[in-house]
């Protein structure tokens, strides 16, 4: 495995560990999820460029669209929880059930 791919994989694993360790605050979890999506985007982009597979060139763009949607929903949820409860603890999300 090339050095660049190894570094990107380590960045993904570090962001995943960040989600597991800092799971009490919503903002920390969202930042770690963005790090995971960024490392996945770079890895998919490098893979499609190295394989010269023309049909997969759209995959990084689709991944960016999903990352943008995830960020928008996460930030909307963060604003709603912060305005309602005054803090961004993830345990407050259990209270949002209808």
Curated annotation (Swiss-Prot):
Where do the TM regions start and end? 1-21, 26-46, 61-81
User: Which EC class, in a word?
Assistant: translocase
* Localization of this protein: Mitochondrion inner membrane
As recorded in UniProt, coiled-coil segments are none
One GO biological-process annotation of the entry reads: ATP synthesis coupled electron transport
What keyword terms does UniProt attach to this protein?
Answer: Electron transport, Membrane, Mitochondrion, Mitochondrion inner membrane, NAD, Respiratory chain, Translocase, Transmembrane, Transmembrane helix, Transport, Ubiquinone
The catalytic activity of this protein is classed by the Enzyme Commission as 7.1.1.2
Signal peptide region: none
Keyword Transcription regulation belongs to the record: no
Q: Name one GO molecular function term.
A: NADH dehydrogenase (ubiquinone) activity
Q: Which reaction does it catalyse?
A: a ubiquinone + NADH + 5 H(+)(in) = a ubiquinol + NAD(+) + 4 H(+)(out)
> Might you report a single GO cellular component term?
mitochondrial inner membrane
- Main function: Core subunit of the mitochondrial membrane respiratory chain NADH dehydrogenase (Complex I) which catalyzes electron transfer from NADH through the respiratory chain, using ubiquinone as an electron acceptor. Part of the enzyme membrane arm which is embedded in the lipid bilayer and involved in proton translocation.
Q: Which family does it belong to?
A: Belongs to the complex I subunit 4L family.
User: Know the name of this protein?
Assistant: NADH-ubiquinone oxidoreductase chain 4L
Source species of the chain: Nycticebus coucang
